[in-house]
Amino acid sequence: AASLPAAHPYTILGTEKVKKYAEEAVSFLQECGIRISGSAERNSWRVTPTGERKASWLTLGDFTPLTSKDEKIGSKALIVNILGYLDFNTKFLADSFEKQGTECRIVALKLEEMERLRKNPSEMRATNIARVMDRDGIWEKAAAQIKGMLKDEDTVVLPAVFGLKDQDVVEKIREAVGVKTMFVATMPPSVPGIRSQMSLKAEF
């Protein structure tokens, strides 16, 4: 706060209060059932929908924070989209990761349960995909297909379209795939964001 202009809200509050409120924010979100990582002491970096790295002091549990702007996500990455889904730009992501030295391969996940959505592009949105994935056995089917696509990749990159109602699904997919699995935010609406909003609404 000391290096900010005198009229900046952080300067007006003072360093100690800003630190106190930041710590309280973390506790509050966790008490609401929202999984987060990060510290007010330093920023981490997360991958944006366009593949850029953005500094952030808190990161939702779906996403994998990076320690630096230039950190490689892995040696070889399998970038997996949902067939027909246009709000997850795999080419942008691959270009960005390859600049950091990660070899990328792009594939598409094809599930017959998505056929109805795919017939109408306006329906092929993150929240609608997530609702389908939440049905019994669908995310498990997706995870098995992803695992079967792996060759020698050490990292899988997926759109964050899983676990609209149950954030445990995200961790279960990571376990099922069996290698480092990163979920990257899609263009809005954001499934993790909507889930967090629902958790907050449930508290008030």
Question: Where in this protein do the model-derived segments appear?
Answer:
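Conserved N-terminal/central alpha/beta ligand/cofactor-binding core
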Residues: 1-76, 81-88, 98-99, 103-116, ...
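Helical element adjacent to the flavin cofactor pocket in flavoenzyme catalytic cores
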Residues: 88-100, 130-156, 161-204
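Short, intrinsically disordered low-complexity segments
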Residues: 110-141
